[in-house]
């Protein structure tokens, strides 16, 4: 299987770089990120047939709590289980519909503000919950 995603994509943060916030995951988060890529992101990329632009992946506690990130205290980004992304030429609503049709395992797929799509994978709980945050 050829992977179209790298760990560095899931670790990159413009806010982290600008404000010098460390974003180094522990081994468990790295393991979760690999599971997210192999079981969810890569199969979805192949199903959609277009590049997915990761806008947020893993977040350290400090990065997640930064006012410009404003992440939820229980965010799955903290454990390496989630990624936010966009796909050129597709709306988040269209992406969510494709995710639902794909049969790919996921815990949550969220259309966030009609700007980006959040997807998470948890090897023990892939309930396929779909949400819309206006």
Tell what function each PLM region has.
Residues 9, 14, 62, 67, ...:
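Solvent-exposed, flexible loop/coil residues
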Residues 38-70:
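Extended, low-complexity, intrinsically disordered C-terminal regulatory tails
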Residues 25-26, 53-59, 89-94:
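N-terminal start-of-chain detector that recognizes signal peptides
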Residues 33, 37-40, 50, 81, ...:
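Amphipathic alpha-helical interface surfaces
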Residues 24, 28, 62, 72:
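A glycine-rich, hydrophobic loop/mini-helix early in the fold
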Residues 73-74, 79-134:
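Catalytic cores and adjacent binding grooves of peptidoglycan-active enzymes
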Residues 1-47, 133-134:
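Extracytoplasmic cell-surface/polysaccharide-interacting catalytic and binding patches
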């Amino acid at each position: 299987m050829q992977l179209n995603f790298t760990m560095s994509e899931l670790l990159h943060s413009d806010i982290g770089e600008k404000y010098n916030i460390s974003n180094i995951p522990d081994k468990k988060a790295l393991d979760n990120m690999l599971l997210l890529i192999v079981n969810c992101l890569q199969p979805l990329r192949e199903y959609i047939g277009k590049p997915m632009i990761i806008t947020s992946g893993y977040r350290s506690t400090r990065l997640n709590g930064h006012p410009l990130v404003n992440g939820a205290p229980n965010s799955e980004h903290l454990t390496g289980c989630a990624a936010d992304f966009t796909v050129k030429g597709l709306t988040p609503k269209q992406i969510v519909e494709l995710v639902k049709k794909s049969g790919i395992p996921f815990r949550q797929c969220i259309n966030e503000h009609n700007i980006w799509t959040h997807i998470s994978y948890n090897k023990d709980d892939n309930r396929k919950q779909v949400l819309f945050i206006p």
